[in-house]
Amino acid sequence: MFRTMMRAKLHRATVTEANLNYVGSITIDEDLMDAVEIVENEKVQVVNNNNGERLETYVIKGERGSGVICLNGAAARLVQPGDKVIIICYGLVSAEEVYKQIPKIAVLDDRNQIIEMLSAEKAGTEV
């Protein structure tokens, strides 16, 4: 049996752009992608803390060090620049590996710079 587990997360990213006329996807600063091991074209879930919207899309690389978090295409209708989002990537993990799998979680500041790296979350934790 395989379980779908969170393996990477960018917590409280700030949307910097929303580009309706782009083909689709989410553009993420490549430094942030590397920090949590998300790769280009990988599927992610985006949760908007401001309006409760949830969507799935794929990732394209943004300029390193830019802090870019840009929702493209139809997804641009679900966010506004300045919105706080959580970007989550899941992976399939075998039953034997479930308790060995350690997620990479980057907590971001308002400029999308990493302020803390976590490997677990406690219930009721506020960041």
Curated annotation (Swiss-Prot):
The keyword Cytoplasm applies. Pfam families: Asp_decarbox (PF02261). Its cofactor is pyruvate. The modification Pyruvic acid (Ser) is found at residue 25. One of its GO terms (biological process) is alanine biosynthetic process. It is an enzyme of class 4 (lyase). Its EC number is 4.1.1.11. Substrate binds at residues 57, 73-75. Keywords: Autocatalytic cleavage, Cytoplasm, Decarboxylase, Lyase, Pantothenate biosynthesis, Pyruvate, Schiff base, Zymogen. Gene3D superfamilies: 2.40.40.20. SUPFAM superfamilies: ADC-like. GO terms for cellular component: cytosol. One of its GO terms (molecular function) is aspartate 1-decarboxylase activity. Pathway: Cofactor biosynthesis; (R)-pantothenate biosynthesis; beta-alanine from L-aspartate: step 1/1. It is found in: Cytoplasm. It catalyses: L-aspartate + H(+) = beta-alanine + CO2. Is synthesized initially as an inactive proenzyme, which is activated by self-cleavage at a specific serine bond to produce a beta-subunit with a hydroxyl group at its C-terminus and an alpha-subunit with a pyruvoyl group at its N-terminus. InterPro entries: Asp_de-COase-like_dom_sf, Asp_decarbox. Belongs to the PanD family. This is Aspartate 1-decarboxylase. It comes from Bacillus cytotoxicus (strain DSM 22905 / CIP 110041 / 391-98 / NVH 391-98). The lineage of its organism: Bacteria, Bacillati, Bacillota, Bacilli, Bacillales.
